[in-house]
A protein has these predicted regions:
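Acidic helix N-cap motif at the loop->helix transition within catalytic regions
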Residues: 27-31, 58-67
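Hydrophobic helical membrane-anchoring modules
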Residues: 1-14, 157, 180-282
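A conserved acidic beta->alpha catalytic loop
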Residues: 53-62, 108
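N-proximal low-complexity "stem/linker" segments adjacent to membrane-targeting elements
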Residues: 1-38, 44-45
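Conserved donor nucleotide-binding strand/loop of the catalytic core
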Residues: 47-50, 61-95
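Acceptor/aglycone-binding surface of glycosyltransferases and processive sugar-polymer synthases
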Residues: 77-95, 100-103, 109-185, 211-229
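Conserved sequence signature across two-component system core domains
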Residues: 18, 22-23, 52-54, 79
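Acidic donor-diphosphate engagement hotspot in glycosyltransferases and nucleotidyltransferases
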Residues: 32, 60, 89, 113-115, ...
Length: 282
């Protein structure tokens, strides 16, 4: 059944895939999917919801299987073991069929209804990226996020207000053709760094962010932060060998200022270690 768009809202051009990465979200995934089934018909006559269960140990997969059995627009992609946030998104993008691909976290900290804020810009931009108007996360996560945003700007030339905001819409052929390797949270940086090299057009739009009401957040753990630091260095190295595809609209050269910043940082760290070593052995 196809529903007409609500008055004042703009229908997205073409079809839409919503990708929902989920890990141990059995308390959240059903209301998120049902909300999407309610909202998405206002924006796209043809849409699908792809839930990627990233090795959950709870009942996430069973909940999604029941939803998929009741509505053919819902599909489940399963990872037998937990492979990471980036791997879950990559699997979801690969499984997508829409002319446009949106992703959103499945923890109820975003409302899919905010797609109405992004929809007016989708036809004219390759990427429409949300940024959190007010971030409802613990202080340590907000501090780390600000530091990380600055690091991404310096190393990769990516100027997003909120690089890790999990509310974005991409041109489908762009995101499906992009070779993605980051298994963890650095997936957003990898996407934007490669999109920049391809000359993809970008629009940023403010969206709402809500406190988590169920489940456990892991994004601010020390293990995740250390993993993100390691992946940042690896991505910086890999970007030296990345070449935009022939289909790229406006290919751009590597970001040399990022190289200078990284080398300067390494030099300062080496100098500091050398100074400490000298003091220790005096």
């Amino acid at each position: 059944m196809r529903l007409a768009p609500a008055a004042g809202e703009r229908t997205l051009p073409g079809s839409l895939t919503l990708v929902l990465p989920a890990h141990n979200e059995d308390a959240n995934i059903e209301p998120v999917v049902r909300r999407a089934l309610e909202v998405l018909p206002r924006h796209a006559a043809d849409f699908e919801i792809v839930v990627v269960d990233d090795g959950s140990r709870d009942g996430t997969a069973a909940v999604v299987e029941a939803l998929a059995a009741a509505d053919g627009r819902v599909r489940l992609v399963r990872h037998p073991r937990n492979r990471g946030y980036g791997a879950a998104l990559t699997s979801g993008f690969a499984a997508s069929r829409g002319d446009h691909v949106m992703f959103m976290d499945a923890d109820r900290q975003f409302d899919v209804a905010d797609l109405r804020l992004l929809a007016p810009f989708v036809a004219d931009h390759d990427i429409v990226a949300g940024f959190r108007l007010e971030r409802n996360d613990p202080l340590h996560r907000r501090v780390f996020a600000e530091i990380f945003n600055v690091t991404v700007r310096v190393l990769f030339g990516v100027h997003l207000r909120d690089i890790d905001c999990a509310f974005k819409v991409f041109r489908g052929d762009l995101i499906r053709s992009m070779p993605l390797q980051a298994p963890g949270a650095l997936i957003n940086t990898e996407i934007q760094a490669k999109a920049r090299r391809q000359g993809a057009s970008l629009m940023q739009v403010g969206v709402h962010h809500y406190p988590r009401v169920a489940g456990t957040a892991t994004g601010g753990s020390l293990r995740v932060i250390l993993r993100a630091m390691r992946e940042t260095v690896l991505l910086w190295l890999r970007m030296h060998w990345y070449r935009p595809p022939a289909t790229a609209r406006k290919p751009r050269p590597p970001y040399l200022l990022g190289d200078a910043a990284m080398l300067a940082g390494v030099g300062l760290a080496a100098a500091a270690l050398a100074t400490l070593a000298k003091r220790r052995w005096r």
